[in-house]
């Protein structure tokens, strides 16, 4: 199916590894010009290089700290200066450590808030200014099913992702008149295919410390589809929502990609 993403300009934050990497590869495969935005320079360059080798789309890496407004502004200025527009923004940056709330400290909360929520605000703010002027655009934010269910050891993370869900609905209402669509994708437990998908800064770097294989097997049994999600599952949903051709009348939605864990 032609998604009409050829030559579209797409920024993917957190694009160096895991879900973000799969999203970048999907967009490049469709012929988009992709900016891999991430703190991890080494992994970001690996991702952009792999995409350029495999697909026809132009993929470049730009180091960016989504919690720093100057860094974010520089990312968007570079993109517009080089390509003249931003058609798609995917907010794929995310970070968490599984800890009970009473075992954490305020500096831990602040880090989760800065990366998972403020980062989405910073990037969406810059994107909307460009997209509203252009009269079209698509913003997709990666949230989590923890935002819907209230998961133990994810109190602050889940709360911030719930904030992302609400924020995306609101900007969908505010900016639809300019032709801009804003949607959210909520993965469940999603693990990389192998270590090559995981960067040093990824929350999945030490996956074995988060979930044992036995725990993952138990989680899979609770799901209607009986299997744990992979980055490509999430990336496929993002690709659909990014396309105005196939999702042009979809905005303000929160789509779970979790094997049926959440059906709300």
Predicted regions and their residues:
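Canonical Rossmann dinucleotide-binding motif of NAD(H)/NADP(H)-dependent dehydrogenases/reductases
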Residues: 3-35
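C-terminal substrate-recognition "lid" of short-chain dehydrogenase/reductases
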Residues: 4, 227-257, 262
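Substrate-binding pocket helix/loop in short-chain dehydrogenase/reductase
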Residues: 100-101, 105-113, 204-208, 215, ...
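Alpha-helical segment proximal to the catalytic Tyr-Lys
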Residues: 129, 173-174
């Amino acid at each position: 199916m032609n998604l009409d993403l050829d030559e579209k300009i797409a920024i993917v934050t957190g694009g160096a590894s895991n879900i973000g990497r799969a999203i970048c590869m999907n967009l490049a495969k469709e012929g988009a010009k992709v900016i891999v935005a991430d703190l991890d320079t080494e992994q970001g360059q690996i991702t952009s290089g792999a995409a350029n080798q495999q697909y026809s789309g132009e993929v470049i890496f730009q180091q960016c700290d989504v919690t720093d407004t100057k860094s974010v502004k520089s990312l968007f200025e570079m993109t517009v200066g080089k390509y003249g527009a931003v058609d798609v923004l995917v907010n794929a940056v995310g970070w968490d450590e599984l800890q009970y709330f009473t075992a954490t400290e305020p500096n831990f909360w602040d880090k989760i808030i800065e990366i998972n929520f403020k980062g989405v605000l910073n990037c969406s703010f810059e994107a909307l200014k460009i997209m509203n002027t252009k009269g079209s655009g698509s913003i997709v934010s990666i949230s989590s099913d923890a935002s819907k269910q209230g998961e133990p050891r994810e109190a602050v993370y889940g709360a911030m992702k719930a904030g992302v869900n609400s924020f995306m609905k609101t900007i969908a209402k505010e900016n639809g008149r300019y032709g801009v669509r804003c949607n959210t994708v909520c993965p469940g437990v999603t693990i990389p295919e192998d270590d090559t998908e995981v960067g040093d800064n990824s929350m999945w770097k030490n996956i074995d410390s988060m979930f044992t294989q036995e725990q993952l097997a138990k989680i899979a049994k609770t799901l209607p589809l009986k299997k744990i999600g992979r980055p490509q599952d999430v990336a496929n949903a993002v690709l659909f929502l990014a396309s105005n051709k196939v999702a042009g009348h979809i905005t303000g939605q929160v789509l779970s990609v979790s094997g049926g864990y959440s059906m709300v």
